[in-house]
From Swiss-Prot:
Organism encoding this protein: Escherichia coli (strain K12)
Keywords: Acetylation, Cytoplasm, Glycolysis, Lyase, Schiff base
Lineage summary: Bacteria, Pseudomonadati, Pseudomonadota, Gammaproteobacteria, Enterobacterales
The protein's name: Fructose-bisphosphate aldolase class 1
Broad enzyme group: lyase
Membership in a protein family: Belongs to the DeoC/FbaB aldolase family. FbaB subfamily.
Active site residues of this protein: K237
Compartmental location: Cytoplasm
Any one of the GO CC terms: cytosol
Amino acid sequence: MTDIAQLLGKDADNLLQHRCMTIPSDQLYLPGHDYVDRVMIDNNRPPAVLRNMQTLYNTGRLAGTGYLSILPVDQGVEHSAGASFAANPLYFDPKNIVELAIEAGCNCVASTYGVLASVSRRYAHRIPFLVKLNHNETLSYPNTYDQTLYASVEQAFNMGAVAVGATIYFGSEESRRQIEEISAAFERAHELGMVTVLWAYLRNSAFKKDGVDYHVSADLTGQANHLAATIGADIVKQKMAENNGGYKAINYGYTDDRVYSKLTSENPIDLVRYQLANCYMGRAGLINSGGAAGGETDLSDAVRTAVINKRAGGMGLILGRKAFKKSMADGVKLINAVQDVYLDSKITIA
């Protein structure tokens, strides 16, 4: 097992010993082997959705824990294939993307329609597929930071996918159209029995104020999570909160002083717990993103993110660039270290 405390370094006590005095854990719907029977059984999803959610939970190294380790590789569209795969050209071949997820013991591999369709007959029965339906691409100039549908729900279903995903840029000029598109797509996905995952990202230049990037503030990302759950996301993917007070800084929208005085603190675990509270207290699962590849600190950064997510009550990590920009062996090692956090019974809910 990974030496988690050593990787956390000076943050070990602050993260591993923290007691949450904001939102009590007994008010949350926490991950567990019985999550589908205990939590999802209340909702209106068809039985096939529950079956496919259980399929996700029963796959990989985290099988039976209620936690998820997902490999996302859609950056070939979002960030360009060259920028994404030049470090490891083998990942230009979709086969190796799926092999990385299998070798690392992930619950699921998430990628574009094209990537997964090109190898679906060989792999769809070996590891659950999550097809990302929409993307932003950086070939159009100037970049409008919009999300365009690249595939239909039916295309994902026909290749054997158990889940679909999409991004909405909440706060952007295009967000209301995106909300309508993805709400309809998620409705259709549920009709076909697929799990729905929303990348609930913020996007507006006004969210950067006085040198602080409030795209990762707990209050604003929390509201994005609430909107994601509103349109039927079974799982919400969100960037880990790094600050708070976005509403106050941009002086727009509605908030309450108790969000900052009672429901959050400066501890990152409490900030992520507020993100989870906005996922209907965990009725929609919260997975945090692993972030960009940063070099020597990737392993410690990924483990830190996993510890915060788990102790806050989150459902897991969706980590891509930190893994696939390394050799396959090192990528597997990094993903396994993250999984070790969720397998470690000594790392408890705060």
